[in-house]
Amino acid sequence: MAPPKTSGKAAKKAGKAQKAISKDDKKKRRHKRKESYAIYIFKVLKQVHPDTGVSSKAMSIMNSFVNDIFERIAAEASRLAHYNKRSTITSREIQTAVRLLLPGELAKHAVSEGTKAVTKYTSSK
């Protein structure tokens, strides 16, 4: 048995009614926020080179780099805490992890900047 035929206008009206119902029933979808270090990377760039810009692709690469380094430091600090039978990762573990992961002069600068940041944080409390 063939389905009943409807005129073109009737089909359009039925379609519009269907759309109106489905539009009202659907809730507005919220976009999930993507966390990024982009604003912080940009602030540092402007401190170092105020007249220099950065492309979105370069910013994405820098963001991936920061995430990768943080992951490596966290993993190394976790390993160090485990070796020493500690359940807490302190600034000491982070400092040792940085010394192990970063080469030479870069490690020295990172440790001094980290120490400065921790001192500033504890003095503000």
From Swiss-Prot:
Instruction: Describe its partners and assembly state.
Output: The nucleosome is a histone octamer containing two molecules each of H2A, H2B, H3 and H4 assembled in one H3-H4 heterotetramer and two H2A-H2B heterodimers. The octamer wraps approximately 147 bp of DNA.
User: Keyword Cell cycle, does the record have it?
Assistant: no
| UniProt entry keywords in alphabetical sequence | Chromosome, DNA-binding, Glycoprotein, Isopeptide bond, Nucleosome core, Nucleus, Ubl conjugation
Q: Which family does it belong to?
A: Belongs to the histone H2B family.
Sequence segments annotated as region (Disordered): 1-33
Q: What does this protein do?
A: Core component of nucleosome. Nucleosomes wrap and compact DNA into chromatin, limiting DNA accessibility to the cellular machineries which require DNA as a template. Histones thereby play a central role in transcription regulation, DNA repair, DNA replication and chromosomal stability. DNA accessibility is regulated via a complex set of post-translational modifications of histones, also called histone code, and nucleosome remodeling.
The keyword Lipid metabolism is assigned to this record: no
Q: Primary place of residence? A: nucleus
Write out the PTM section of this UniProt entry. Answer: Monoubiquitination of Lys-120 gives a specific tag for epigenetic transcriptional activation and is also prerequisite for histone H3 'Lys-4' and 'Lys-79' methylation. GlcNAcylation at Ser-112 promotes monoubiquitination of Lys-120. It fluctuates in response to extracellular glucose, and associates with transcribed genes.
Q: What is this protein called?
A: Histone H2B
Q: Which SMART domains match?
A: H2B (SM00427)
Tell me which residues are glycosylated.
112
Q: Where is this cross-link: Glycyl lysine isopeptide (Lys-Gly) (interchain with G-Cter in ubiquitin)?
A: 120
Q: What are the recorded GO MF terms, alphabetically?
A: DNA binding; protein heterodimerization activity; protein-containing complex binding; structural constituent of chromatin
CDD domains for the chain: HFD_H2B
Cellular component terms, GO, for this chain's entry?
nucleosome; nucleus
Under Pfam families, the record lists: Histone (PF00125)
Q: Give compartment(s).
A: Nucleus; Chromosome
Report the source organism: Chironomus thummi thummi (Midge)
Q: Which InterPro entries match?
A: Histone-fold, Histone_H2A/H2B/H3, Histone_H2B, HISTONE_H2B_site
Region forming the signal peptide = none
